[in-house]
């Protein structure tokens, strides 16, 4: 694998069959192309659609370094690996599991990304001043559901690329059309 650092964020859902998406989808790919170990596994929060495959991932990698699993995310933590700055941000006043999502800001000299977990508008409002004006890449909050992605948040981050992590045929029909329009 070309780099010494490999981090995985979330592990996908448990499927109705009892399998999980990590084991059925990502693991076969990683066995042929991926790393033999992870530097860090970050679990944004405990909802099944993010954590359903965590046990399989931890078992496969014999993973020791985890955040959001045994070691909860708290406050703000920043570190640098190979010239890339990582800032782990969490809303200290969060009242819901989603708003307690571990979020991650990744910055290099050339680009930046923000991975938002399932935060909603209250967490967006409390974290907004910790975020840069403009990012290159954003994983939209809560799969593009209607509640987060406030206009202030969208304008502050002004992402060049937005990814909505959602099933095409998902029961919640994410991303919501209004949210997609806000990012255009």
Protein language model annotation of sequence segments:
Residues 1-184:
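Non-globular, low-confidence helical/coil segments that flank catalytic cores
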């Amino acid at each position: 694998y070309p780099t010494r650092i490999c981090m995985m964020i979330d592990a996908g859902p448990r499927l109705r069959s009892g399998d999980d998406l990590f084991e059925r989808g990502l693991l076969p790919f990683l066995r042929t192309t991926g790393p033999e170990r992870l530097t860090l596994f970050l679990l944004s929060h405990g909802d099944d659609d993010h954590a359903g495959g965590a046990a399989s991932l931890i078992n496969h990698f014999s993973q020791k370094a985890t955040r959001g699993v045994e070691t909860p995310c708290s406050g703000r933590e920043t570190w640098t690996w190979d010239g890339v700055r990582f800032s782990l941000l969490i809303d200290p006043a969060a009242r819901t599991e989603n708003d307690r999502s571990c979020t991650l800001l990744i910055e290099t000299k050339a680009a930046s990304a923000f991975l938002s977990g399932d935060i909603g508008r209250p967490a967006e409002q409390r974290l907004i001043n910790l975020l840069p004006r403009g990012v290159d890449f954003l994983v939209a909050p809560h799969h593009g559901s209607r509640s987060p992605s406030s206009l202030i948040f969208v304008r502050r981050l002004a992402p060049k690329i937005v990814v909505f992590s959602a099933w095409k045929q998902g029961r919640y029909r994410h991303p919501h059309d209004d949210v997609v329009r806000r990012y255009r």
